[in-house]
Amino acid sequence: MSSGEPAAVSIPIHDHHGKAPATSSAVPAAAAAAPAAAPAVAPRKVGIPFFRRGDHHRGSRCLAFLDFILRIAAFGPALAAAISTGTSDETLSVFTEFYQFRARFDDFPAFLFFLVANAIVAGYLVLSLPFSAVLVIRPQTIGLRLLLLVCDMIMAAMLTAAASAAAAIVDLAHNGNLRANWVAICMQFHGFCQRTSGSVVASFLTVVILMFLVILAACSIRKR
């Protein structure tokens, strides 16, 4: 080949009809003419603004809020049990010249312990509400949560002992004990037995809520 002849250009043919493949020279122009895509908009978060702050603390904050609600719920039965026991005194209309038949809660040491324990637990639940509110705001405070856990366990143990002792006396008042020749007194003192029985039920309900509080605190500390 001489230097004056134009160089031959080879075009590859891949199909069976002898046609050259189409060139893609118009593709960049079409891409340039296409409008720019709009920037992606992040989805707006929906929910309570207080619980949206600090997503990494959301679970602990929800547990702390549930702890606060349960403390309010436990305060009612504990206070009701203390008031019902303290006002359970009953005096029969039948009496003699020298003796008057009556039933008083302070005649039974178990009921006296029961009343004091429920009053202490009710007062503790009220005093613990500000600390529980602090944990809702600052869920990362482990020391305060550990303090409430220990106090909740102490209150639950004390109230369980008091409610169990009172339940034994209530059962004795309803059924008596034939072997010991102790007669049931609920046949005569209806109001006394109704109030003390309701107090025991309310107190055990408080114990159940306190156990839930202990479990919640343990789960929160374990997450940390």
From Swiss-Prot:
Keywords in alphabetical order: Cell membrane, Cell wall biogenesis/degradation, Membrane, Transmembrane, Transmembrane helix
Annotated TM spans: 63-83, 111-131, 146-166, 201-221
Top-level division of the source organism's lineage: Eukaryota
InterPro entries referenced in this protein's UniProt entry, alphabetically: CASP/CASPL, CASP_dom, CASPL
Cytoplasmic side: 1-62, 132-145, 222-224
Keyword Transmembrane helix: yes
Main subcellular location: membrane
The keyword Transmembrane is annotated on this UniProt entry: yes
One cellular component (GO) term of this entry: Casparian strip
Membrane topology label: Multi-pass membrane protein
Gene Ontology BP, a term: cell wall modification
Pfam families: CASP_dom
Signal peptide residue numbers: none
Region (Disordered): 1-22
Compartment(s) where it occurs, according to its Swiss-Prot or TrEMBL record: Cell membrane
Regions of this protein lying in the Extracellular compartment: 84-110, 167-200
Annotated NCBIfam families: A_tha_TIGR01569
Oligomeric form and interacting partners: Homodimer and heterodimers.
Similarity remark: Belongs to the Casparian strip membrane proteins (CASP) family.
Function according to Swiss-Prot or TrEMBL: Regulates membrane-cell wall junctions and localized cell wall deposition. Required for establishment of the Casparian strip membrane domain (CSD) and the subsequent formation of Casparian strips, a cell wall modification of the root endodermis that determines an apoplastic barrier between the intraorganismal apoplasm and the extraorganismal apoplasm and prevents lateral diffusion.
Protein name per the record: Casparian strip membrane protein 1
Origin species: Oryza sativa subsp. japonica
